[in-house]
C-alpha cells in the first residue's frame, strides 16, 4: 500500500472552548477524585498550564493525581494537542517523513542510539525530522550531542526544513518550539519524579510527522503510547521498550506496539529477527557529550564498535519497516552497509556546516 503523508490531527477545539462548558476547578476536582478526564478536558487543562494560568500547588496536585492513577491515552493525547496548538510553526513537508525519538529517563546512560540512527536512516534515503532536548537521565541527550558536533540548536524553522529537504535530516530543539513548557518546569523540578510531561516530548514534534519510532522508558507505556498515537492521527508508528532501554534492544527482547492505519499489533523482537549478534548492555555505555561525539563519529565513519553498529542497525531496520520496507533482516543489512560506508558521517558534517 502506498503511504501518504497525512498530517496527524492537531487542529481541534481551542482549550477555551472546553472551559466555556466545564470550569478548570471541575477538571481539577475530577483528577483529585482519581477520575479520568476527557481528551477535551485534558487539552483545556494543559492549555492553561502552558499559558501559566495554574498555581504551582494546582499543577503539582494535577500531575501527581494523574501519575498515581495512571495516565489514559485520551488524556495524553489531549495534552499533546494543547502543546502542538501552542507550538511555534514549522513548514511541514508534503512528502513522507518520520521522527525517531525516545522519552529518555531509562537510566541506562547509553550512547545516543536514536540520534545516530537518524543520520543512518537519512543515508538510507529516508526523511527524518528529529525532535529532541537536553538530557533527561543520561549524561548526554540528543541536543547535548548535536552541540558537541557543532550543529546549531537554534536553527530557524525554514533552515531546518531546508536541511530536511537537502540532507534528509533535521533536528528540532524542543525549547525553541514549545515556549510554554517553562511554566511547568519549576514544579517538575520540585516533584523530582516522572510525570506525563516525560512522555509528551516524543508526541509533540512541531513538524507533525505521519510516521514515528518512539522508545519509552517502561514496558507498561508501550501499548498506551501506541493508543495515544492512534488518537493523534499518526499513520504508522512503532512504540518500543527493550530490556530497560527506550530503544530497540540487541541485548534483550524488545516489546513493540505497532500502529498501522488505525490498527495496533503488539509483538516481540530479538536480535535474531534482525540477523544480528547479541551484545551486552554494558557494550553500549555512553559518556559525556564529547565522549559520545567521538564514539558516534567513529561509528558513522565505519570505524566503530560492532555492538554500536548493531544497535543502530536494529533501530534503523524497524524505522525502515514503517516506510514500507517490511523485511527486518534486509533492512538491518542495508543500515550496516551505510554505516560501514561512512555516508552517514558526511551528513553530520554537512548539517554542522549550516550555521
Curated annotation (Swiss-Prot):
Binding site for anthranilate 2: 188
Catalytic activity from the UniProt record: N-(5-phospho-beta-D-ribosyl)anthranilate + diphosphate = 5-phospho-alpha-D-ribose 1-diphosphate + anthranilate
Lineage of the species this protein comes from: Bacteria, Pseudomonadati, Pseudomonadota, Gammaproteobacteria, Enterobacterales
InterPro entries from the UniProt entry: Anthranilate_Pribosyl_Tfrase (IPR005940), Glycosyl_Trfase_fam3 (IPR000312), Glycosyl_Trfase_fam3_N_dom (IPR017459), Glycosyl_Trfase_fam3_N_dom_sf (IPR036320), Nuc_phospho_transferase (IPR035902)
Record-given protein name: Anthranilate phosphoribosyltransferase
Enzyme Commission number: 2.4.2.18
Cofactor: how and how many bound: Binds 2 magnesium ions per monomer.
GO CC annotation: cytosol
Gene this chain is encoded by: trpD
GO biological process: L-tryptophan biosynthetic process
Binding residue positions for 5-phospho-alpha-D-ribose 1-diphosphate: 102, 105-106, 110, 112-115, 130-138, 142
Cofactor(s) required, per the database record: Mg(2+)
Organism, scientific name: Pectobacterium atrosepticum (strain SCRI 1043 / ATCC BAA-672) (Erwinia carotovora subsp. atroseptica)
